[in-house]
Amino acid sequence: MRTLKSLVIVSAALLPFSATAFAADAIQEQPPVPAPVEVAPQYSWAGGYTGLYLGYGWNKAKTSTVGSIKPDDWKAGAFAGWNFQQDQIVYGVEGDAGYSWAKKSKDGLEVKQGFEGSLRARVGYDLNPVMPYLTAGIAGSQIKLNNGLDDESKFRVGWTAGAGLEAKLTDNILGRVEYRYTQYGNKNYDLAGTTVRNKLDTQDFRVGIGYKF
């Protein structure tokens, strides 16, 4: 009986120490809390933008009197547009206006391009921080013919299509490269009583820089 009583007293005395050791083990076995990970905000192409471009055009003017003339030269202008974004699909509308210095003569007939502009739809795919895109729409340009005796200038309307790559340089600054093909169709010019039929196609490569609002 005395031995049993002694065991009970010893067990009661050791119980607090056992509970403390068990609690310490339980605390030590808890996994560490992971540090919070900062997620960079996703860039959005949505919204308005404007910018400037510089390019070079390789043109081909077919005429009914002297055949083909190739008035190649530099061009420059401005563009502006508005984007919408649905997941990774970016779409919107863009317009541009500029001036082409393309001019060349053949056998006394000169073809000269001046003002040019377009209004186009644009659709791209977000590959943050770049966006490849396709574009197409209507185009217009002032085109002048001169045969030395007379000249006539007409505003021509046609279509344009192309592709490009836009890149986010900063949160607001955009850079781009773009290829465009434009066709202005056929038009008759009356030069000193001679009817000259002209068709003009242009291919140009442009680089641009823009600001996103």
UniProtKB/Swiss-Prot annotation:
Location of the protein in the cell: Cell outer membrane
Signal peptide (from-to): 1-23
Protein keywords: Cell outer membrane, Membrane, Signal, Transmembrane, Transmembrane beta strand
Main localization, broad class: membrane
Top-level taxon in the UniProt lineage: Bacteria
InterPro entries xref list: Enterovir_OMP, OMP-like, OMP/PagP_b-brl, OMP_b-brl
Annotated GO CC locations: cell outer membrane; host outer membrane
Family: Belongs to the Omp25/RopB family.
PANTHER family reported in the protein's UniProt record: BLL7405 PROTEIN
Stated name of the protein: 25 kDa outer-membrane immunogenic protein
Organism: Brucella melitensis biotype 1 (strain ATCC 23456 / CCUG 17765 / NCTC 10094 / 16M)
Organism placement in taxonomy: Bacteria, Pseudomonadati, Pseudomonadota, Alphaproteobacteria, Hyphomicrobiales
Gene: omp25
